[in-house]
Amino acid sequence: IGEVLIDLTQTGKDARGIPQFAANPGGAPANLAVAASRLGAQTAFIGKVGADAFGRYLKEVLAENKVDVSGMAVDANHPTTMAVVSVDATGERDFSFYRSANADVMLCKEDISDEALKASKIVHFGSVSLTADPSRTATLDAAARAKKLGATITYDPNYRANLWKNKEDAIAQMKAPLPLVDILKVSDEELPLLTGTTDCESGTAQLAQNGIRLIFVTLGANGVFYRFGDKTGHVAGVPCKVGDTNGAGDTFFGAALSKLCKEELDTLTVDKLESILAFANKAASITTSRHGAIPAMPTLAEVEG
């Protein structure tokens, strides 16, 4: 559940020095749905796009990647969201969003049916949906309904500073869903925002007090730290030449969830979890070695090969 948008990514400059941009599909929950789908999971996307060329294109991209788009709504009065993405020499990204009254924010409770939630083993969302209403209320309501219906709730507090009024508001809203969450992914940059510490052991122990059963802290090239109940550990990253990091975290989480949806947390062993995380790290490294998010995401054969 969440945003799907156009990433306008600079591809270079023409002979006159005018920047050239490619319109790429993006949005963390949509990226994750595609990543998991390419790796063999059945996925569906619930969100809202404008009645415009970009909205039609995004729906087509998700459908082409075998993501069920029957829950995607179209808003005739608000345009599809865009972000301008610039990538520096190390592959790190900077986002500028065009999103004051755009379609993804207009997702409302009525757009998310109980039938869609009942059909889901895992229901995932991110914090971009929580920046404003009605999407904030719709997302939290859907997560609460899905939890009651027996789904596993997964969450990525995907912090984008320029989407929030201020850091304090961001932290408060990003923390709000934590008591609903079963599986959480945070980056090493988001951990101190939510906990006040950069220490993975103490930070995840603090987060686990919300009842979160499985927590991942992604560490970029250094892999992932995990907390599973009272057990903690680290799984090394897979070295690669960086193209750009766009979609790497979404690929990691999508890959992990594509495997975890076949497991029960009650019976999951640490050995099995670590093999799932090694698989997810490899998938993320493949995405990182290429350019773009969705176009860069690997197939099952590529990760297992």
Residue ranges and their predicted role:
Residues 128-205, 222-223:
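Conserved beta-alpha-beta core of the PfkB/ribokinase-like small-molecule kinase fold
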Residues 1-68, 107:
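Glycine-rich phosphate/adenosyl-contacting loop at the front of the ribokinase-like
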Residues 42-125, 304-305:
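Conserved N-terminal subdomain of the carbohydrate kinase-like
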